Amino acid sequence: MRWRRRKEGRKRREWFSGAGCAAVGGVLFLLGVVAYLALGNALTNARREQVAKLKERIREAGQPLTFEELNAYYPAVPDEENAALVYQEASVLLDAIDPNGATVDALLRSLELSSRNDASLPELQQEIGAFLERCGGVFVHLERAATLPKARYPIEFSVGPTEAPAHYGYLKRCLRLEKLRALHAILEGRQWDAAPCLERMQHLAESLRDEPSVASQMLRAAYRGEQITCLKAALNVAYLYPETLADFQRLSLETSDPEPMVRALVGERCYWVEVFETPGAIGRVSAMGRVLDYFDPAGQSTMRQ
């Protein structure tokens, strides 16, 4: 009897130390996997519900979630009121005179490195004047564009932030041409003619105001900043009247209106929603680690305050 009990105890110990232990471990592992998957599924469902509720708030706010909706969100402008079309026409004329803006850049660089006492300044003034005379047709278009209050550029939203729209380049060239024109007026003692040039520079920058893109709003701010660099160059080559300084101050102040950046964030959010929900709709998808949670309508209200 005692021998039988010892034999049974030895079998139990062998079971727990061998195959039995492995079986228990396997069961525990499977239970852990099931628990992990169940938790992951619960978290995924919770996240989906959160995203669905966010989309509902976005829809209620009348904001877009697809490229088609984003295209409608960027206000349409009749051709006869669209400054963007006139800027495009001006750029075609300017490219025929100064391809890629090389001459304007060189003349501005020379001016920015000059001072009032430079002996070469009169010669540079004549060179600038001769170049500006060739740009008369361009100025006609730029002056006409400045009278139009709205602008809408042809932009393909599905391309996303991987390609710069064509109008970024030609707007910069037109803006720097107006900057050169303002500095030339100051050099010739016609400081009262500088203010209209600065106003056209401002109008050109503000033509990007409604574009729902962060890149466009950053460029808009950079283009507004060109007025500051214009003032710096003007102070190097001339004594400015108080009225001229007042014009620079009035036209160089940055607006505190957050609405353009709110629109830009709406556009960026729309792009990334498309990236993750319908990646085939994107021209080229940038490699990004994750999508940032951009402002929902409640966050935008806070931003506007």
Language model features by range: what are they?
Residues R2-Q305:
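Short acidic linear motifs
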